[in-house]
């Protein structure tokens, strides 16, 4: 781990910005925003009332990071690691983001998917300290006063969930708060968005999870989920309260709402507020980026693909709609593009006239039934003969060996995306995909899988189609540009910006996404491209327009190095403060 540490350390008072504070003594150590642990300098200890409250040694952030990594190595349980890492955030915010940024590839699966799903399911059992804002259905009429209780005055990014569809785990109620918290950690770690500008929110309207309603450690309302007009009124009141306090251009990201509400709220609020839904639009952008990367490998334009989805919920529909936009950009009409996309859900293939209900959002991808109607997903593959299958059902190993072999027999280079989270819900493993297609497939997954070595010695590095490639960079650009509304074209631009960062060498390794180790650079580059797009298309409202967009973005990213807490000390000219000599 020493190789990951920043070997050049400079005295904090010289290298760091000065942070003006009013607190002194113990409160500085109890506030994670100002606490440095053993890294307070001697001058800070003496002038800020800390001398004697800490052991005499003065540490660098490097040593603190090294201590963290050595302690982490002693732990074996992912949940134990999660509790330890998030405990660092509660005590020392700068150190938390320093260690996360230094080893993002290894630590992201702990602070976010897949471990965050386990942490959410155990939220009441591992609870240490509340994070974020909790608003319940019982608070109707008083939401603004609750928002006013949040101590930060300059929030620019809100991630909100109602806990109904947490990853592939279903309705977790307020236990879902771990998702907004984890998401905003990645806003900061990947894109440098200031943590004090971020607000995680959980809307509690009850839960239909019977196990939680019987759990003595559950922390939400002990009632069935409210699905009446009162629920809609609460969301309306929340949106108004946030923007009344923090401004109309405050970014509000909807996260893990149920399918019906996710689409409904996106359509309802997108022209009124600065909002997006990561499950719909973020997932769509990262999936499209993977397809655009596959296009580079097989030299087959996206407009010539036939795509079959396993799942027809918000993720599938979001991906499908963005693929349609890309196909239209490549010369097809909207109707021609929609006809190239099929969906298979738990009731079977989406076809006209089927008994199972079809949502209005699914209608563009509901086609006339083929001559032989498939009973299983494998049948659908053999009948429709798709070039690409995309799994977003969250139902486990439904890309069976027979499905994968069928794709390999139909296509020279089959595209197989198993995007469901967490790992246990993935449609197949990377090893299954590469082995059963003899290394010919182009594979991406929603959860991390390690490199796969085939019997002939070839090694493939599967790409992880994680939304983290998209949402931090998009959020940074939107915030810096004072954007008022976020169109789907922004996510199309982000997908293209992501694909453009892949090297030929990485494509040859089987990667459809850049290495996660490069996520900070990737996110900043996406933010730059999206910023350029927003200004070029009159969607940016921060003036004057910066001439150098790259410089503008890079100069406004938050850093994890410690700030100096000392007041500015400087000299005045002696003559300016000396009284004149009075002569009689």
Swiss-Prot record:
Classification via Gene3D superfamilies: Malic enzyme, N-terminal domain, NAD(P)-binding Rossmann-like Domain
Record annotation: effect of changing residue 91 to T: Abolishes activation by fumarate
Transit peptide: 1-18
Requisite cofactors: Mg(2+); Mn(2+)
Localization terms from the record: Mitochondrion matrix
Keyword Metal-binding appears in the UniProt entry: yes
Chain sites annotated for binding a divalent metal cation: 255-256, 279
GO biological process, one term: regulation of NADP metabolic process
Protein name as it appears in the record: NAD-dependent malic enzyme, mitochondrial
Organism encoding this protein: Homo sapiens
């Amino acid at each position: 781990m020493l190789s990951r540490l920043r070997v050049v350390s400079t005295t904090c008072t010289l290298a760091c910005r000065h942070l003006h504070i009013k607190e002194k003594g113990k409160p500085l150590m109890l506030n994670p925003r100002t606490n440095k642990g053993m890294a307070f300098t001697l001058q800070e200890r003496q002038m800020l009332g800390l001398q004697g409250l800490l052991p005499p040694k003065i540490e660098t952030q490097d040593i603190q990071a090294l201590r963290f990594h050595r302690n982490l190595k002693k732990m074996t349980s992912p949940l134990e690691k999660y509790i330890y890492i998030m405990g660092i955030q509660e005590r020392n915010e700068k150190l938390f983001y320093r260690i996360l940024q230094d080893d993002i590839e290894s630590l992201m699966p702990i602070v976010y998917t897949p471990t965050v799903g386990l942490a959410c399911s155990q939220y009441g059992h591992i609870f240490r300290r509340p994070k974020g804002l909790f608003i319940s259905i019982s608070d109707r009429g008083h939401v603004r006063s609750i928002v006013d209780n949040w101590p930060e005055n300059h929030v620019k990014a809100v991630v909100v969930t109602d806990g109904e569809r947490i990853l592939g785990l279903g309705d977790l109620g307020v236990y879902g708060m771990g998702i907004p918290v984890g998401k905003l950690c990645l806003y900061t770690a990947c894109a440098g968005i200031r943590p004090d500008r971020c607000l995680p929110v959980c809307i509690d309207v009850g839960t239909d999870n019977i196990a939680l309603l019987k759990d003595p450690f559950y922390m939400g309302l002990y009632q069935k989920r409210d699905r009446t007009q009162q629920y809609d009124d609460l969301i309306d009141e929340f949106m108004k309260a946030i923007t009344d306090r923090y401004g109309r251009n405050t970014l509000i990201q909807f996260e893990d709402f149920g399918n019906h509400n996710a689409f409904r709220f996106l359509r309802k609020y997108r022209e009124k507020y600065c909002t997006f839904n990561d499950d719909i639009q973020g997932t769509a952008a990262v999936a499209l980026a993977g397809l655009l990367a596959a296009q580079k490998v097989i030299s087959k334009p996206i407009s010539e693909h036939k795509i079959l989805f396993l799942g027809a919920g918000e993720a599938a529909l979001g991906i499908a709609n963005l693929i349609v936009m890309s196909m239209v950009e490549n010369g097809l009409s909207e109707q021609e593009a929609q006809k190239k996309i099929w969906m298979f859900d738990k009731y079977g293939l989406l076809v006209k006239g089927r008994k199972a209900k079809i949502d209005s959002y699914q209608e563009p991808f509901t086609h006339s039934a083929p001559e032989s109607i498939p009973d299983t997903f494998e049948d659908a593959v053999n009948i429709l003969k798709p070039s690409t299958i995309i799994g977003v059902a969250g139902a486990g190993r439904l890309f069976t060996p027979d499905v994968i072999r069928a794709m390999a027999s139909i296509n020279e280079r089959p595209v197989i995306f198993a995007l469901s989270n967490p790992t246990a819900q993935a449609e197949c493993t990377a090893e299954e995909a590469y082995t059963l297609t003899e290394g010919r497939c182009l594979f991406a997954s929603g959860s991390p899988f390690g490199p796969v070595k085939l019997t002939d010695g070839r090694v493939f590095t599967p790409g992880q189609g994680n939304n983290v490639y998209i949402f931090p960079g998009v959020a940074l650009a939107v915030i810096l540009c004072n954007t008022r509304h976020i169109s789907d074209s922004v996510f199309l631009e982000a997908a293209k910006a992501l694909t453009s960062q892949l090297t030929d060498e990485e494509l040859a390794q089987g990667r459809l996404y850049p290495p996660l180790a490069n996520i900070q650079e990737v996110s900043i580059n996406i933010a730059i491209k999206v910023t350029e797009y927003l200004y070029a298309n009159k969607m940016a409202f921060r003036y004057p327009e910066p001439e150098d967009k790259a410089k503008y973005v890079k100069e406004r990213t938050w850093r994890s190095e410690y700030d100096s807490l000392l007041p500015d000390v400087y000299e005045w000219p002696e003559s300016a403060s000396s009284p004149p000599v009075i002569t009689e």
